[in-house]
Curated annotation (Swiss-Prot):
Organism annotation: Rattus norvegicus
Keyword match Transferase: no
Keywords: Developmental protein, Differentiation, Disulfide bond, Glycoprotein, Membrane, Neurogenesis, Repeat, Signal, Transmembrane, Transmembrane helix
Primary gene name: Sema5a
Topology within the bilayer: Single-pass membrane protein
Sugar-bearing residue positions: 147, 168, 227, 277, 323, 367, 536, 591, 717, 898, 933, 1015
Transmembrane regions listed in the UniProt entry: 969-989
Gene Ontology biological process terms from the UniProt entry: axon extension; axon guidance; axonal fasciculation; blood vessel endothelial cell proliferation involved in sprouting angiogenesis; branching involved in blood vessel morphogenesis; branching morphogenesis of an epithelial tube; cell chemotaxis; detection of light stimulus involved in visual perception
InterPro entries associated with the record: Plexin_repeat, PSI, Sema5A_sema, Semap_dom, Semap_dom_sf, Semaphorin, TSP1_rpt, TSP1_rpt_sf
Annotated protein name in UniProt: Semaphorin-5A
Record's subcellular location: Membrane
Domain TSP type-1: 540-593, 595-651, 653-702, 784-839, 841-896, 897-944
Function: Bifunctional axonal guidance cue regulated by sulfated proteoglycans; attractive effects result from interactions with heparan sulfate proteoglycans (HSPGs), while the inhibitory effects depend on interactions with chondroitin sulfate proteoglycans (CSPGs). Ligand for receptor PLXNB3. In glioma cells, SEMA5A stimulation of PLXNB3 results in the disassembly of F-actin stress fibers, disruption of focal adhesions and cellular collapse as well as inhibition of cell migration and invasion through ARHGDIA-mediated inactivation of RAC1.
């Protein structure tokens, strides 16, 4: 392109002029400390992910007892995954049926809500207890943990699983088989409860519709600790008088609680709750009131909790740590009690300090807990607040909300370090080191991004596996496995030590960053954790994306053309804090229009003729430049011609005449040569040859044969008797030759004859003695070689498993002499020997692992085995010595009683047998539990008055004979007795009628009106409870509308509440809030 493009106006219009140096940065901004961030691209090679088509909401994670599999609950699916790489072992689809979905739609719920969201996922022995919302009709199943399609039982999920997937809930399964669940018990979620079911103990729940027990709670977690079951939740604070405020709570119940008697029946008698405080200290403390998640470290009795501010306030989160002893101290302290709704909340002494779930040994309330039932009904809330271990939260962060927490205890070089993993609502995990002492603070070690840039979503679940140092994260569309030890990520000693990672240290021997377990020497392993790591804020500039192509103009001399231009900026990111500027063009120009231009003419080509008129050519092309993108093409011709040699006459034409005929062939057969010729006219200088040759008569000549005459007889040798031999020769030759004179001597023919010495018999001819080749020679003394006999076979090279032996012979019987033939064949032979395999002695394999104990109690046994296969004995080898099986006793403790009481004996059947039954009271029987029969039979036991039917049949004939013995005396006795009996009956009837008339007369007297129950059957029971509030008395007898028949695992529709129309008032005119 001629000239330069003038694009200054384009640069100014697109704003692409940038300074050569980075813009001035705020020094304070460049010096502030920020925590390291591990991007999704950096953490990607360490991650393992599992996804499944159509599966979402991976919100429930748990491990099998052997910690080899991860069990995952998602919407409409259950999965079993390998812990190593999250590969799929088994997938089970668990959807709602169409009828249930239609019923859900009819209640105004959306398609998203009317699905089966897994909300309970608990492992008990080799069984998996799982519950799902099932389109607002919760259902639970008990499955085999090794095969999720094998369903052992299916029961209602009411009171065990929430109806809505939006409701928070928690559940746990104790070792004895009881299920403790905290969830909403009805469709709209207005009846929250902490409920116990299954197992051997009676079902219990918190009081229904009583805000002092539970006030719109959001359940977070539950733990089985000692004699108690603890629940953690947040709820509207009933003791807060000024506005609506949410408090976090810790509640507990005794595991041996069986409810009250006459009061608090089917209701907890040991339920107590206390407030959890997590606040930032100051003149006016800043409270983090809403508990979001907890994590329990049983080895240290520590409970880590995540607390946040209210959703309507500024976003802020904190981590507070509570000691179990502090929680127990609050429950041992005084209660906070409100006499009535207009009274203040005041402390009240605890009637049972240091309560440890003791029970009554005797009396009417045997087996009930030591708490007084009236106290259990009134005193629920503790006065003292549970304070954290430290006055300042272990970790605080503004402008973010944490949703889940997991804690790992790591052995550093000098001390144990607690590492807290916090899940944020925007899809990252923050790794925090807890304070090392009361005076030190926490450190944010790093933040792990689980999604690519510009994408985020909340984390659904968080599970840590301490034995393998692995973190499992449940997200909306997949599950992620994150290794906690990523020491090899740091390549240098400075990066390893500067990361301040308690998992990692620099091994001076191996010269690399390793974990403590991987190090070769503790003394050579360097680590530093007291300080917090900071991120280098120096950022090198990087170009952002190119802008779209836009039209622009350019000038080329006097012509104006158009182009397409695009630009990019150094802002992704922009260089900061001394970072490098972007390298490369900030603008690209393409598709500029260009007018075509002619190239210079080429030189004239040589004349087309050397004499006479010819022409010459020259050319040019429109490629200087070539027209592009709408530019103008060149104007004019691209080729010119001119004449040449128009005055140079040509000389006479010199040329060859035509070829003459072929001459005679030089040979009649066997291949000859023939020639033809031409002459040059008008001169001697014609180009080329005047003679041309070709082969001829290439066919083979006929075969010629020629025999020489016999030579004269010549004597050969003389024998002992004076006779002698004579011989003569002749030769025969044949060949395909054109000339017979070219024949050469070929085969030799010899004849021999014997001539006697006396000449009487003349000479006799033996005929042909032999034919020899032309160069051959005949000798009567030639000796051909012959083999000697074979030697014996040599010793075998091996005693077994296939060896080799050989034998030899020599060509000396006789040796070849005077040109005789040598021996034919091998002089050495080989043969396989001892082909049978060698004997192999047996060797024991390693002992197998001990098998599972055959019984969980009462004495069982386990065993281990080994086999004689390493290798096995073979081919006569010795067998292994010793035992192939070892057994040992296990679980010798006495078994608890697992059977219910025997039922009453049944009525005798036709075969004279009675039957009684019993049932196993354990939901998950393991090993020898519930061993024995469920039925028992015995022969019927008859009393002395029972007469079998056979006896009656046999005595019928005797009775017929006795009927004839009835006489007159008998008739008189019967008549007298009947008269006396009639008189007595008449007297009784008269007396009854007189009393009835007296009562009717009394009924006509008018009495004052008093309230009476519509159903007076409970009046006596109400009178027994005069000392309690009457409303409470009605509540005690107004049974909960949800009562479980645990044996049959269904809800009894015939048990409904009773309603009374009258009101009962106490002397104090007290009312209890509902």
């Amino acid at each position: 392109m001629k000239g330069a493009c003038i694009l200054a106006w384009l640069f100014s219009s697109l704003g692409v002029w940038r300074l050569a140096r980075p813009e001035t940065q705020d020094p304070a901004k460049c010096q502030r400390a920020e925590h390291p961030v591990v991007s999704y691209k950096e953490i990607g090679p360490w991650l393992r992910e599992f996804r499944a088509e159509n599966a979402v909401d991976f919100s429930r994670l748990t491990f099998d007892p052997g910690q080899k599999e991860l069990v995952v609950g998602a919407r409409n699916y259950l999965f079993r995954l390998q812990l190593e790489d999250l590969s799929l072992i088994q997938a089970v689809q668990w959807e709602c049926d169409e009828a249930t979905k239609k019923a859900c739609y009819s209640k105004g719920k959306s398609k998203e809500e009317c699905q089966n969201y897994i909300r309970v996922l608990l492992v008990g022995g080799d069984r998996l207890f799982t519950c799902g919302t099932n389109a607002f009709t919760p259902v639970c199943t008990i499955r085999s943990l090794s095969n999720l399609t094998e369903i052992h039982d299916q029961i209602s999920g009411m009171a065990r699983c929430p109806y809505s997937p939006q409701h928070n809930s928690t559940a746990l399964l104790t070792a004895s088989g009881e299920l403790y669940a905290a969830t909403a018990m009805d469709f709209p979620g207005r009846d929250p409860a902490i409920y116990r079911s299954l197992g051997t103990l009676p079902p219990l729940r918190t009081a229904q519709y009583n805000s002092k027990w539970l006030n719109e709670p959001n359940f977070v977690s539950s733990y089985d600790i000692g004699n108690f079951t603890y629940f953690f939740f947040r709820e509207n604070a009933v003791e807060h008088d000024c506005g609506k405020t949410v408090f976090s709570r810790a509640a507990r119940v005794c595991k041996n609680d069986i409810g009250g008697r006459f009061l608090l029946e089917d209701t907890w008698t040991t339920f107590m709750k206390a407030r959890l405080n997590c606040s930032r200290p100051g003149e006016v403390p800043f409270y983090y009131n809403e508990l979001q998640s907890t994590f329990f470290l049983p080895e240290l009795d520590l409970i880590y909790g995540i607390f946040t501010t209210n959703v309507n306030s500024i976003a802020a989160s904190a981590v507070c740590v509570f000691n179990l002893s502090a929680i127990s101290q609050a429950f041992n302290g005084p209660f906070k009690y409100q006499e009535n709704s207009r009274s203040a909340w005041l402390p009240y002494p605890n009637p049972n300090p240091n309560f440890q779930c003791g029970t009554m040994d005797q009396g009417l309330y045997v087996n009930l807990t030591e708490r007084n039932l009236q106290d259990a009904q009134k005193f629920i809330l503790m006065h003292e607040v549970v304070q954290p271990v430290t006055t300042v939260p272990s970790f605080m962060e503004d402008n973010s909300r944490f949703s889940h927490v997991a804690v790992d205890v790591v052995q550093g070089r000098d001390t144990l370090v607690h590492i807290i993993y916090l899940a944020t609502d925007y899809g990252t995990i923050k790794k925090v080191r807890a304070p090392l002492s009361q005076s030190s603070g926490s450190c944010l070690l790093e933040e792990i991004e689980l999604f690519p840039e510009r994408k985020s979503e909340p984390i659904r679940s968080l599970k840590i596996l301490h034995s393998q140092s692995v973190l499992f994260v449940g997200l909306q569309e997949h599950v992620v496995k994150i290794p906690l030890k990523r020491c090899h990520f740091h390549q240098t000693r400075g990066a390893c030590i500067g990361a301040q990672d308690p998992y990692c240290g620099w091994d001076a021997v191996m010269k690399k960053c390793t974990s403590l377990e991987e190090s070769l020497s503790m003394t050579q392993w360097d680590q530093s954790v007291p300080t917090c790591p900071t991120r280098n804020l120096t950022v090198d500039g990087s170009f952002g994306p190119w802008s779209p192509w836009t039209p622009c103009t350019h000038t080329d001399g006097t012509a104006v053309g158009s182009c397409l231009c695009r630009s990019r900026s150094c802002d992704s990111p922009a260089p900061q804090c001394g970072g490098w500027q972007c390298e490369g063009p900030r603008m690209e120009i393409t598709n500029c229009s260009r007018n075509g231009g002619w190239t210079p003419w080429t030189s004239w080509s040589p004349c087309s003729t050397t004499c006479g008129i010819g022409f010459q050519v020259r050319q040019r092309s429109c490629s200087n430049p070539t027209p592009r993108h709408g530019g103008r093409v060149c104007v004019g011709q691209n080729r010119e011609e001119r004449y040449c040699n128009e005055h140079l006459l040509c000389p006479p034409h010199v040329f060859w005449t035509g070829w003459g005929p072929w001459e005679r062939c030089t040979a009649q057969c066997g291949g000859g040569i023939q020639a033809r010729r031409r002459t040059c006219e008008n001169g001697p200088d014609c180009a080329g040859c005047n003679v041309e040759y070709q082969p001829c008569n290439t066919n083979a000549c006929p075969e010629l044969k020629k025999t020489t005459p016999w030579t004269p007889w010549t004597p050969v040798n003389i024998s002992d008797n004076g006779g002698h031999y004579e011989q003569r020769f002749r030769y025969t030759c044949k060949a395909r030759l054109p000339d017979p004179n070219l024949l050469e001597v070929g085969r030799q023919r010899i004849e021999m004859r014997y001539c006697s010495s006396d000449g009487t018999s003349g000479c006799s001819t033996d005929g042909l003695s032999g034919d020899f080749l032309r160069a051959g020679r005949y000798s009567a003394h030639t000796v051909n070689g012959a083999w000697s006999a074979w030697t014996s076979w040599s010793q075998c090279s091996r005693d077994c498993s296939r060896g080799i032996r050989n034998r030899k012979r020599v060509c000396n019987n006789p040796e070849p002499k005077y040109g005789g033939m040598p021996c034919l064949g091998p002089s050495l032979e080989f043969q396989e020997c001892n082909i049978l395999p060698c004997p192999v002695d047996g060797v024991w394999s390693c002992w197998s692992s001990w098998s599972k104990c055959s019984a969980t109690c009462g004495g069982g046994h386990y065993m281990r085995t080994r086999s004689c296969t390493n290798p096995a004995p073979a081919y006569g080898g010795d067998i292994c010595l010793g035992l192939h099986t070892e057994e040992a006793l296990c679980n010798t403790q006495t078994c608890p009683e697992n059977w219910s009481e025997w039922s009453e004996w049944s009525v005798c059947d036709a075969s004279g047998t009675q039957v009684r039954t019993r049932q196993c009271i354990l939901l998950f029987p393991v090993g020898s539990q519930c061993s024995g029969n469920t039925t028992e039979s015995r022969p019927c036991v008859f009393d002395s008055n029972f007469i079998p039917e056979v006896s009656v049949a046999r005595s019928s004939s005797v009775e017929e004979k006795r009927c004839g013995e009835f006489n007159m005396f008998h008739m008189m006795a019967v008549g007298l007795s009947s008269s006396i009996l009639g008189c007595l009956l008449t007297l009784l009837v008269y007396t009854y009628c007189q009393r009835y008339q007296q009562q009717s007369h009394d009924a006509t007297v008018i009495h004052p009106v008093s309230p009476a129950a519509l159903n007076s059957s409970i009046t006596n029971h109400i009178n027994k409870l005069d000392k309690y509030d009457s409303v409470e008395a009605i509540k005690a007898f107004n049974k909960n509308n949800l009562i479980l028949e645990e044996r049959n695992k269904y809800f009894n529709p015939h048990l409904t509440g009773k309603t009374y129309s009258n009101a009962y008032f106490t002397d104090l005119n007290n009312y209890d809030e509902y």
